[in-house]
Regions:
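Active-site-adjacent structural elements that line small-molecule/cofactor binding pockets in enzymes
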Residues: 1-144
Length: 144
């Protein structure tokens, strides 16, 4: 799997990759990259499984005012120069599922959800929330 959305990364993905990992791309931006990679793979006479496109983002059941989220958002914006909401979803399970559905609608089918918390107990609680309120409801997602 190859990551990145530069033209060079897209060409590498189409020529050598077996999948692609979005970095901080919005669902719509990821969709454009997916299409370009599929075309690059076709130009290189390579098969590319349409279910080998992924995205990862931080998730927090809570509020943007929660300390772990404020720190993560600040770090994200400082590191990337982009708005934190591109790489973090905060709220409830339905909001996380909405973001996932947006990616699915744009050709992305695999996800890395990174719980946001401080300390083992909070990380465990956030992970439990992901399992209960996202994974257990993933059958609600519609294929594009």
């Amino acid at each position: 799997w190859i990551g990145g959305s530069s033209e060079a990364a897209i060409e590498r993905s189409g020529k050598y990759g077996t999948g692609w990992q979005a970095a901080f791309d919005t669902p719509e931006e990821a969709g454009v990259v997916v299409e370009k990679i599929l075309h690059a793979a076709e130009r290189n006479s390579r098969p590319m499984d349409k279910d080998h496109f992924s995205a990862g983002f931080g998730v927090r059941f809570g509020s943007w005012e929660d300390e772990p989220v404020k720190k993560m958002a600040e770090d994200f914006e400082k590191r990337t120069g982009k708005e934190a909401s591109r790489g973090i979803v905060v709220g409830n399970g339905d909001q996380i599922l909405e973001r996932i559905q947006s990616y699915v609608d744009n050709g992305v089918s695999k996800f890395i959800l990174r719980p946001i918390g401080i300390g083992d107990e909070e990380m465990f609680e956030q992970t439990e929330q992901i399992i209960e309120n996202v994974l257990n409801k993933s059958d609600q997602l519609l294929e594009a």
